[in-house]
Curated annotation (Swiss-Prot):
The keyword Transmembrane helix applies. Keywords: Glycosyltransferase, Membrane, Transferase, Transmembrane, Transmembrane helix. This is Glycosyltransferase family 92 protein F49C12.5. The keyword Transmembrane helix applies. The lineage of its organism: Eukaryota, Metazoa, Ecdysozoa, Nematoda, Chromadorea. It comes from Caenorhabditis elegans. It is a single-pass membrane protein. Belongs to the glycosyltransferase 92 family. Its EC number is 2.4.1.-. One of its GO terms (molecular function) is glycosyltransferase activity. It is found in: Membrane. Residues 155-444 form the GT92 domain. The chain crosses the membrane at residues 9-29. GO terms for cellular component: membrane.
Length: 507
């Protein structure tokens, strides 16, 4: 048995106060290995459009509104000689069948620190009815960009799951996805790469309506030097803030509530029978809240390494609270918020405030042990896992656990899924690589207070030695080279898809 203290899905987070300290005191980031100060007077700005949503009508953005999320190389390193134009506004052109307009709009910074060269920004502007074409304007040049309409399928709660990479943790997924379904939430999971059999399992759950897989493409600036815009080493945690903001915008008009969780963070309702009822109850008591904030409580858990023997009941039976808390995550009413960072928004509307929840916590599966043998599931008594506060309260009742187990068994009996369960990974090879890397390259500095030694954090810190017997599905897309424009050159990708031909990597 080997304990897993952190997984690829686990997002290493810098507390906001620490990040601002870094910004003020150190402003440190790495421009790439062996690079020199840029010997030019001006560094050109490169913006990759990760999201562009057009709303014919929005309760918070207005009519005919465009919402943009971009990754842009706005941060300058201390040893950099170049200046960049840093324009205060974006210029956007739009056309419909009868007319066209050109408008200017400011952008808001989402990333609250200068640790990475490339940061996330958000912008919104009202355009024309029935827009057919949207173009970004740079000087006298136009760049047409693809845009989408937000989801119109009404849902009470959407869980936005942080981007997964080289993911093997199928037990975490099953634990989370069945709980979300039971309490009336839909998982929208952002995926970079995963073990092939795990990907196939998620696809089957997607077909059954439990969740949606969202391909999360890498930011790339084709034919641009890393000195100018380093999209490999200089983006924070696989662009997680952009992913969460994308999810917020995608379900802005269709979901009552949206929450942002890692795969090993599972929020279980305690104050009401469903997520929506609990969130509504908390929001009503704090009418001026822009979001509610749940802390995370760490738990140990054991799970079989063999897919055909998997049991949710046995996972619940093994849960033990570590009595150790970590910074949590938020739940938002999407009408009140337009963008968010990893933990919470860098800014909140002045008339609104956050509400810190004291009546419930996120169950964080901090340490998972993969075991060879488990008790016989059919004869095993259900043990209700205790709530973290040493009271007699339990996280779930016996009846609720029984219902979750029945739901799992029904899925496992489906012929296609039954075959996949037999093929799920029984070792955590890439998990160990990333855990050791993160501990050596990030955590030892973070937890020892050696903040000045931290460079832009994320999976790019790690090496991914390929295993000859393990294959992965990895996201790819079509990227486009662009003519350099001033003040900003705009880039984008289209046709996102998964392929088995690119290996097991985080980018």
């Amino acid at each position: 048995m080997r304990p897993i203290h952190r997984r690829p899905e686990k997002v290493a987070i810098l507390v906001t106060a620490v990040l601002f300290a870094i910004t003020i005191i150190f402003s440190v980031f790495k421009n790439g290995k062996g690079t020199s100060p840029i010997p030019v007077k001006e560094r050109p700005l490169k913006a990759f459009i990760t999201s562009a949503y057009y709303y014919s009508s929005s309760k918070s953005l207005g009519k005919n509104a465009l919402a943009l999320v971009m990754s842009i190389n706005l941060v300058k390193s201390p040893n950099e000689l170049a200046q960049h134009p840093n324009p205060p506004e974006l210029v956007i052109s739009a056309e419909n069948d009868t007319t066209s307009i050109m408008v200017k709009t400011p952008y808001s910074r989402v990333t609250p620190h200068d640790v990475c060269q490339i940061i996330t920004v958000f912008a919104t502007v009202q355009l024309l009815p029935n827009v057919k074409s949207i173009k970004m304007v740079s000087g006298n040049e136009l760049t047409e960009i693809p845009f989408s309409k937000p989801s119109s399928l009404k849902r009470d709660v959407v869980v936005c799951t942080s981007p997964l990479f080289v993911s093997e943790q199928w037990q975490n997924f099953l634990f989370a996805v069945h709980i979300y379904k039971k309490f009336d939430a839909h998982m929208n999971l952002y995926l970079v790469s995963s073990i092939t059999s795990f990907y196939e399992l998620m696809k089957e759950y997607e077909k059954e309506g439990y969740m949606t897989i969202q391909p999360w493409v890498s930011v790339k600036y084709p034919e641009v030097s890393k000195i100018i815009a380093d999209s490999y080493d200089q983006i924070e945690f696989r662009n997680q803030a952009a992913a969460q903001t994308d999810c917020l915008l995608q379900f802005k008009e269709s979901a009552r509530f949206i929450t942002f969780l890692d795969l090993d963070d599972v929020l279980i309702p305690k104050l009401a029978p469903t997520y929506a009822e609990e969130f509504q109850k908390l929001m009503v008591t704090k009418k001026r809240s822009s979001f509610i904030f749940y802390h995370k409580e760490n738990y140990n858990v054991a799970a079989t390494r063999y897919g055909s023997k998997f049991s949710l009941k046995n996972m619940f039976n093994s849960m033990e609270c570590q009595n150790n808390r970590e910074t949590g995550k938020i739940v938002v009413n999407p009408k009140h918020l337009n963008f968010t960072w990893i933990h919470y928004p860098p800014i909140s509307p002045e008339e609104l405030a956050k509400h810190e929840v004291t009546e419930n916590v996120i169950t964080h599966l901090k340490t998972i042990v993969w075991v060879d043998e488990e008790p016989d599931g059919e004869n095993q008594k259900i043990i209700e896992p205790l709530y973290y506060d040493n009271s007699t309260d339990t996280i779930l009742s016996r009846q609720q656990i029984k219902e979750l187990e029945t739901d799992l068994e029904n899925m496992m009996m489906k012929p296609n899924i039954q075959k996949i369960f037999a093929q799920l990974p029984d070792i955590h090879y890439y998990t160990d690589l990333v855990v050791n890397c993160y501990n050596d390259r990030y955590y030892k500095y973070h937890y020892s207070g050696r903040i000045s030694e931290i460079t832009c954090p994320g999976p790019q810190l790690c090496e991914y030695h390929q295993h000859p017997n393990i294959t992965c599905m990895r996201v790819n897309a079509t990227y486009h080279s662009m003519k350099t424009l001033s003040p900003i050159t705009y880039y984008y990708a289209n046709d996102p898809h998964f392929t088995s031909e690119m290996g097991c990597y985080a980018h």
